[in-house]
Amino acid sequence: MSWVRSVPLEQMRANALALARAAKALDMPLVLTSSLEDQMQGPLTEELAEIAPTEYEGRIQRSGMVNALDDPNFAAAVQATGRRNLIIAGVTNDVCTVYPTLTALQQGYRVQVVADAGGSMSRLADDVALRRMESAGTTLTSTNMILTELAVSWASPAGQALQPIVGALIPT
């Protein structure tokens, strides 16, 4: 995460963790992956282990594969969810998010990329990656947008479960 300069790091971290909390609250599949944890990319943030211990423990640790969907274990884990609609966020948007998004679109998935739950080394790199994904057919969204879309109504069970997660993101 420390590579990100396109968005405030703490905001991005809070957004990514909110997505994980929402997935757990709504009993949605959560597939985590990392690349070269013991090298320059480093491990996933430890807060994910607290929020989603089973998913963190079962994360797909890629051995340098840039496009996560080129990794057979990750591709199998995504397919095993049985879902055709994917919500994707990652660090960095211009590497770790763009390529699996493009591949997922080619494979017929509907993809929403949560732009503010990831970032890139520069604003320009982020903008280019987001434009490329959008022009290929992904829907760009924000953390607040996707959480409220999943809520549908604050009176619904999903809305009730997501209220504290969304509320924690409101600037004070």
Where on the chain are the PLM-derived regions?
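Active-site acidic carboxylates
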Residues: 1-64, 110, 127-135, 139, ...
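Short, conserved glycine- and acidic-residue-centered signature motifs
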Residues: 8-12, 89, 93, 97, ...
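Generic beta-sheet signal
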Residues: 33, 114-116, 143
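Short, well-ordered secondary-structure micro-motifs
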Residues: 42-44, 70-73, 98-101, 124-125, ...
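Internal catalytic-core helix/loop-beta-alpha segment
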Residues: 62-102, 106
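Short gly/pro/ser/thr-enriched loop/turn and capping motifs at secondary-structure boundaries
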Residues: 67, 94-95, 118-123, 147-148
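A short glycine-rich beta-strand->turn/loop micro-motif centered on a GG-aromatic cluster
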Residues: 87-90, 110-123
